[in-house]
């Protein structure tokens, strides 16, 4: 059993992790080499690994040049492995159960939402570009629904109810280098949801269905088939393919236009949707449902970070409403007099 090994229990969990993937982030697989290096912390029995050992090793990763996001992913493999050992009473305390901000500098780049004008410029370019116009509807849907790109990739014909105008999100399509494509549950329990379509999203799905060229043999992945978004070989598109198309579309736009676009990714589309919905005045609980956030705190951070410009705009709106109400009240008093 892994808990009796001379090595860390976390290291022994890697084969199972590679086999099943993780519900949070399959991109963590490249970091398994960090876990298998023979460092002092891994030569200890798991019941002798202290919080100090874990923190020193984490700090050492950043000193070696690992980014905050990468270290966050690595720790995301270790913490649940040690948590399992703690729950099974093989260790008293999880040494990796601490906040990274306690020991690391967050040097990760902030993924801001793009302004509506930037979103429009990007989508207009994609729509009219000979190379990338075939991606337009998928990119449009990402901007207008806030779907995770893995959720979009996993959509099948059965998940789209055009009569009820709903999108059924209950799985996602992932891929790893050694395992290939596979179906996974949504990132969180809250990720399983049914989303209503707006008119423009409904029209986008109409185009997707009309333009989808059914392959001679539908690809079947873990029992799922009829994927909506296919590449030129008739295979289901996955996250990295969407990310590359976004990257290359922005690069092509910036090469052809003096007015440059910022970096735009599928996740920025999601953050943009979330921000726009928060600005529109939607309730936090409703937005939490639409986004599939497991915690209301994640959703509330969007409201907290809207910024001074948005705060000023909201104050101005309230002031304008106040003036209108005062004028209406004055008019009523005048008529009564």
Q: What name fits each language-model region?
A:
Residues 3, 85-95, 162-165, 171, ...:
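Proline-centered turn/helix-capping motifs that create local helix->coil transitions or kinks
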Residues 1-90, 108, 130-133, 235-241, ...:
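N-terminal core-binding DNA-recognition domain of tyrosine site-specific recombinases/integrases
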Residues 105, 113, 172-173, 291-317:
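Catalytic-site neighborhood detector that most strongly recognizes the C-terminal catalytic loop/helix
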Residues 48-51, 63, 92, 116, ...:
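Phosphate-coordinating loops and pocket residues in cytosolic domains that bind phosphorylated ligands
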Residues 159-166, 282-304:
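Short, polar N-cap/turn motifs at the start of nucleic acid-interacting alpha helices
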Residues 72-76, 87, 91-155, 163, ...:
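Basic, Lys/Arg- and aromatic-enriched nucleic-acid-binding interface segment
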Residues 64, 68, 124-135, 145, ...:
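Short, basic (Lys/Arg/His-rich) helix/loop patches that form interaction surfaces
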Residues 164, 175-177, 181-192, 199-201, ...:
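C-terminal secondary-structure termini that scaffold catalytic or DNA-interacting sites
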């Amino acid at each position: 059993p892994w808990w009796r090994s001379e090595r860390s229990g976390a290291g022994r969990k890697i084969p199972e992790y590679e086999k099943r993937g993780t519900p949070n982030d399959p991109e963590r697989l490249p970091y398994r080499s960090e876990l298998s290096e023979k460092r002092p912390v891994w030569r200890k029995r798991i019941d002798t690994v202290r919080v100090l050992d874990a923190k020193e090793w984490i700090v050492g990763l950043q000193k070696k040049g690992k980014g905050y996001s990468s270290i966050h992913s690595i720790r995301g493999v270790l913490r649940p492995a040690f948590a399992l050992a703690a729950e099974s009473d093989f260790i008293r305390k999880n040494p990796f159960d601490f906040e990274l901000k306690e020991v690391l500098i967050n040097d990760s780049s902030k993924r801001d939402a793009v302004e509506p004008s930037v979103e429009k410029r990007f989508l207009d370019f994609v729509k009219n570009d000979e190379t990338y116009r075939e991606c337009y509807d998928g990119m449009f849907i990402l901007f207008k629904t806030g779907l995770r790109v893995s959720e979009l990739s996993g959509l099948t014909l059965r998940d789209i109810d055009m009569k009820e105008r709903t999108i059924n999100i209950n799985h996602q399509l992932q891929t790893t280098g050694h395992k290939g494509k596979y179906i996974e549950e949504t990132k969180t329990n809250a990720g399983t949801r049914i989303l209503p379509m707006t008119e423009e999203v409904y029209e986008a799905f109409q185009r997707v269905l009309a333009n989808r060229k059914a392959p001679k043999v539908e690809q079947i992945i873990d029992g799922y088939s009829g994927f909506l978004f296919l590449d030129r070989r008739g295979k289901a598109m996955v996250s990295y393919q969407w990310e590359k198309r976004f990257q290359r579309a922005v690069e092509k736009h910036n090469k052809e236009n003096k007015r440059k676009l910022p970096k735009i990714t599928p996740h920025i589309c999601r953050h943009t949707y979330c921000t726009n919905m928060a600005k529109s005045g939607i309730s936090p609980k409703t937005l939490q449902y639409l986004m599939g956030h497991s915690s209301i705190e994640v959703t509330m951070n969007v409201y907290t970070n809207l910024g001074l410009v948005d705060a000023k705009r909201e104050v101005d709106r309230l002031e304008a409403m106040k003036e209108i109400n005062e004028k209406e009240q004055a008019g009523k008093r005048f008529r009564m007099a």
